[in-house]
């Protein structure tokens, strides 16, 4: 199968390239870029010297459609909403890693992303690619809206209790931390080494664009849920997300009962690892892998639950989940090309 990657010079695109280089069902990866067309790919990423000698190709829709079988879009927001409608006539399956296809209501997208939404007919065709929860819809989809990094960690952490009706629909607080690669490769003052090193800061308070994505999905599972409280923090590390989620049980249960709910819920999900009671994950334990590790407990004094969910933001939070969705769409094993051991230490 010939694979195309638009936005190959960004971190998400580079991570897809890393995975698909050795994927058993990818015969060739063709790389496209609007900013560096014609350049050697290993000039943008010297760690790929001797691993690829490809040049970056221009983004020309008709040409791309004629030379690939499957397309990953790893470009910044605003690109996919413009390009995806142009591929409609070619019946090319697409996985989009930006937020352009995730929000079903165009006015909600425009409020949070501050840009024009994709055409409604494209949004209606897009399936939300939370692999463990939407497998059946993903199998037959033409367009996949790959989930954001924070929503992936948060929603995998919340799903067992939301879907079982176990928690108070008015009480969900999410305190999330991310490494700097989540901001992308383009330099900025906020992610400059001197600004990030030895520092820890909150950002986009009450304004993070992943808020409506989380709320939209939770309300699809249970329409009674009220708006959530969601805060994000930047920590001085390259990769990783930790989402600490606080919620309240409707009925009393102990930590062992909670752990059993999570273990049963994810028993057929290879990439979700539920910790034993009393054990909680760290970001280093999923680094470079497609795993999501989850720990859960309850404070029996307050009947409030703490869920800790960790992922590698570039893998399970982006490229890894995109390839997992590629596998599902093509009837392959979900683990094909993704059985990376986490890098430790």
Curated annotation (Swiss-Prot):
Quote the catalytic residue positions.
Answer: 149
GO BP: any one term: L-arginine biosynthetic process
Class of the enzyme per the UniProt entry, highest EC level: oxidoreductase
The EC number of this protein is 1.2.1.38
CDD domains, A to Z: AGPR_1_C, AGPR_1_N
The listed locations are: Cytoplasm
Q: Which UniProt keywords apply?
A: Amino-acid biosynthesis, Arginine biosynthesis, Cytoplasm, NADP, Oxidoreductase
Reply yes or no: does the keyword Cytoplasm apply. yes
The GO terms describing molecular function are:
N-acetyl-gamma-glutamyl-phosphate reductase activity; NAD binding; NADP+ binding
Stored Pfam families: Semialdhyde_dh (PF01118), Semialdhyde_dhC_1 (PF22698)
Task: Give the primary localization class.
Answer: cytoplasm
Which PROSITE patterns is this protein grouped with? Answer: ARGC (PS01224)
Xref: SMART domains: Semialdhyde_dh
Pathway listed: Amino-acid biosynthesis; L-arginine biosynthesis; N(2)-acetyl-L-ornithine from L-glutamate: step 3/4
Lineage, top-rank taxon, reads: Bacteria
Q: GO CC annotations?
A: cytoplasm
Give coiled-coil spans as residue ranges.
none
Write down the chemical reaction(s) this protein catalyses: N-acetyl-L-glutamate 5-semialdehyde + phosphate + NADP(+) = N-acetyl-L-glutamyl 5-phosphate + NADPH + H(+)
Q: List, alphabetically, the Gene3D superfamilies matched.
A: Dihydrodipicolinate Reductase, domain 2, NAD(P)-binding Rossmann-like Domain
Instruction: Check the record and name the PANTHER family matching this protein.
Output: N-ACETYL-GAMMA-GLUTAMYL-PHOSPHATE REDUCTASE, CHLOROPLASTIC-RELATED, N-ACETYL-GAMMA-GLUTAMYL-PHOSPHATE REDUCTASE, CHLOROPLASTIC-RELATED-RELATED
Describe the task this protein carries out. Catalyzes the NADPH-dependent reduction of N-acetyl-5-glutamyl phosphate to yield N-acetyl-L-glutamate 5-semialdehyde.
What family is reported? Belongs to the NAGSA dehydrogenase family. Type 1 subfamily.
Q: What is this protein called?
A: N-acetyl-gamma-glutamyl-phosphate reductase
What lineage, starting at the top, does this entry show? Bacteria, Bacillati, Bacillota, Bacilli, Bacillales
